[in-house]
Amino acid sequence: MESSNRSSNNQSQDDKQARFRGVRRRPWGKFAAEIRDPSRNGARLWLGTFETAEEAARAYDRAAFNLRGHLAILNFPNEYYPRMDDYSLRPPYASSSSSSSSGSTSTNVSRQNQREVFEFEYLDDKVLEELLDSEERKR
C-alpha cells in the first residue's frame, strides 16, 4: 500500500513541474534535450544534458528555430517573437516635427505615391486569385 502512495506522490510531483517540449528528466535529476531532425527522416538530434529544465528548453528552442524558422513550436516564443511596440508600427516616413517645411512637402508626396502591401503566407490559389481580382476591380 505504501508503494502505491509513493508512486502517486512521485507522479503528482512530476505533474507539478513544468513540462517542456523536447526535454526529458533523467533519473539522477538532470534534464536532457533533443529534437527530431526533419532532414534526416525524424532522427533524434542530441542537444545535451542541462542542470535545469529551462536551460534544456531554451536549447531546444534554439535548435527548433534554426531547423524550422518561424514555423517552429517553441517553449518560450516571446524570446523569438517579441511584441511589436507602437514605435515599430510607425511608417519610415514619419519623421520628427523638427523637419523643414520643404521636407514635409516631399514626405506628403511620397505618402500619396505609396500603397499598402500585405504579405500572406500559405494561401491556396483560390484566395490569392480573389485578392488579385478585388484589387483589379478597384481600378
UniProtKB/Swiss-Prot annotation:
GO-annotated molecular function: DNA binding; DNA-binding transcription factor activity
Keyword Plastid applies: no
Compartments where found: Nucleus
Superkingdom of the source species: Eukaryota
Ranges of Low complexity composition bias in the record: 1-12, 95-107
Keyword Chaperone attributed: no
Gene3D superfamilies attached to this UniProt entry: AP2/ERF domain
GO cellular component: nucleus
Location (main, coarse): nucleus
Region Disordered: start-end pairs: 1-25, 87-112
Family matches, as SUPFAM superfamilies: DNA-binding domain
Keywords recorded for this protein, A-Z: Activator, DNA-binding, Ethylene signaling pathway, Nucleus, Transcription, Transcription regulation
Listed GO biological process terms: ethylene-activated signaling pathway
DNA-binding region: 19-77
Annotated family: Belongs to the AP2/ERF transcription factor family. ERF subfamily.
Chain's role: Probably acts as a transcriptional activator. Binds to the GCC-box pathogenesis-related promoter element. May be involved in the regulation of gene expression by stress factors and by components of stress signal transduction pathways.
Subunit structure: Interacts with MED25.
Protein name as annotated: Ethylene-responsive transcription factor ERF098
Organism of origin: Arabidopsis thaliana (Mouse-ear cress)
UniProt lineage: Eukaryota, Viridiplantae, Streptophyta, Embryophyta, Tracheophyta
